[in-house]
């Protein structure tokens, strides 16, 4: 297979992890990287780097993507920033009409989980327990302190605050876009689970993780939990999942409670790739060929540790 891959946001941690997966896949690929910044390490890791406009400038970004797709004979686009994932989801019909292939989840899954408030409603409808959640404007102090305040959109922990009193609530509420209030799950047992489906089979892989600064996974232990497998299969079935998503759960009182779902490849993608769960490669293969290829076996035990690295020029 000889294909050109367009990978966005190569200045970010996620893109670098995806790039490692692709390079170890054995596929014959040329990776063209884009980013809004040029002074980044990622541009030295790809075969060709092109500076990109911001996705929020929709008309300019749409033209940029259309032009580069044609000029570079791109086979597939992998968006790796939240704003770019949102852009491609919003313009799905446009790119479908042009037969431009993009690595994004199916519309039904995106509609169910892109909004964090809608996520809790969707999961409850599926019979899955979630933290009690309110829109900020409807919240009447039904929850005791501490509780969580976060934005309805986006991923990661940048817009997540633990609120301990009225002053903190008023302060962060005014500084958070589209805030929601959520029950605080008082547990140190946190798990991250990748769910991949090609529309026929469902693959599930979980880590029990320890978080470091910025909410990044610093230590990840491979685990097999039947309850997480059951939750994942219900989610995949109910949204007819096509693609890879990531659910974050805490174990509280013996129950696994999802509190976040990310609608893209997650930052632990290379960790699980190392253990044989190669969802980034499977997804690319499936979009390009209609098959995930040789899945092989993935490991049921092991530990990953995150370390810092440097690139010198």
Question: How would you name each of these model-derived features?
Answer:
Residues 183-190, 194-244, 251, 262-289, ...:
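ATP-dependent carboxylate/phosphate-activation module, predominantly the ATP-grasp catalytic core
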Residues 1-103:
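ATP-binding N-terminal substructure of ATP-dependent carboxylate-amine bond-forming enzymes
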Residues 109-188, 197-200, 226:
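Active-site nucleotide/adenylate-binding loops and adjacent lid/helix of ATP-dependent enzymes
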Residues 255-256:
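Conserved protein kinase catalytic/activation segment
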Residues 282-313:
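Peripheral (often C-terminal) accessory segments that flank ATP-dependent C-N-forming ligase machineries
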Residues 2-6, 146, 192:
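Residues that mark the start of a beta-strand
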């Amino acid at each position: 297979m000889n294909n050109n891959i367009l990978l966005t946001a190569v200045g970010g941690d996620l893109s670098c992890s995806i790039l490692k997966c692709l390079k170890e896949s054995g596929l014959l690929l040329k990776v063209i990287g884009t980013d809004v910044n040029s002074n980044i390490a990622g541009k030295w890791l790809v075969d060709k780097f092109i500076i990109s406009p911001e996705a929020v400038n929709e008309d300019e970004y749409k033209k940029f993507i259309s032009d580069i797709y044609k000029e570079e004979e791109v086979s597939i686009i992998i968006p790796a920033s939240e704003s770019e994932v949102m852009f491609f989801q919003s313009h799905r019909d446009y790119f479908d009409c042009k037969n431009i292939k993009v690595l994004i989840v199916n519309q039904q899954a995106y509609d169910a989980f892109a909004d964090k408030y809608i996520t809790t409603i969707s999961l409850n409808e599926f019979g899955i327990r979630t933290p009690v959640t309110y829109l900020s404007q409807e919240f009447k102090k039904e929850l005791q302190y501490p509780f969580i305040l976060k934005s309805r959109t986006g991923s990661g922990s940048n817009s997540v605050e633990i609120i301990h009193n009225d002053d903190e609530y008023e302060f962060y509420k005014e500084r958070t876009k589209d805030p929601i209030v959520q029950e605080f799950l008082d547990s140190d047992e946190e798990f991250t689970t990748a769910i991949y489906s090609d529309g026929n089979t469902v693959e599930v892989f979980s880590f029990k993780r320890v978080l470091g600064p910025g909410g990044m996974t610093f230590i990840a232990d491979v685990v097999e939990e039947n309850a997480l497998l059951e939750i994942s299969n219900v989610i995949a079935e109910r949204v007819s999942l096509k693609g890879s998503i990531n659910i974050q759960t805490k174990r509280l009182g013996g129950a696994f409670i999802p509190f976040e779902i990310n609608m893209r490849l997650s930052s632990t993608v290379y960790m699980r790739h190392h253990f044989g769960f190669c969802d980034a490669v499977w997804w690319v293969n499936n979009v390009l060929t209609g098959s995930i290829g040789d899945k092989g076996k993935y490991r049921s035990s092991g530990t990953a540790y995150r370390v810092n690295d440097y690139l010198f020029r």
